Amino acid sequence: MDLTIVTSHWKENLEWLKKSKFPVVLINKEGADPTCFEPQSTVPNRGYETLAYFKYIIENYENLPGHVAFIHGHETSWHHMHDRPLMEVIEGANIQKYEYIPLNNFFRYYHFHDEAPNLESAPSGMKLKTLWYRLGFPPVPDGCMFLLAPSSQYIVSKKRILAIPKNVWRTWYQVILNCSKDDELILTVFFDFVQQVIFDGNLMVNIQPDWFSFKYEPKFWHLMPEFCNPKPSSV
């Protein structure tokens, strides 16, 4: 498999990645903890993993591997919803057939509008519609339905990355780098949500049963009581 793992890193323990059969490229955040890998680049501690992903794409645009697995750096997380370790998920990906494969097994339906401030991950609200047009994405009908693959960890082909001009990647990088602190979170969440649209080209991710060599059951936000049921207020 012509695949490279690219990981964003700040405080995560990356020892588990030493077992990888694939090359590992590290993009550090400023102030990151020491780790077992030599970073290729260091970026400001902004934009969560998104800034690191964009940095890698910009710096390696002319010599990308056949496929890139973009990951956050932690071996386990609430959004890892396959029944096996993340490395096994990457190893089982059917990249011979598919050019974009989300790795979290976590999907969310979303209407094309600006969401009120009700998500812990986006206390300022999720400005999908506002940012969609501000950043030059093509028109879509108001209120149309998206099916998204959030918490951006995915495998994507060189072909799909190169379908976006390098100057666009640079623009998106600068937008996050230079935004106000108030806008940083909603911009990061926006790119976290729409990475699937950028690479897959569809508003509704087309979930495939043979994305992986193992069987899996897709997990949906609206069917998870831990996300959809409001927590009781503390008194």
Predicted regions and their residues:
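ER/Golgi luminal nucleotide-sugar-dependent glycosyltransferases, focusing on the catalytic module
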Residues: 1-235
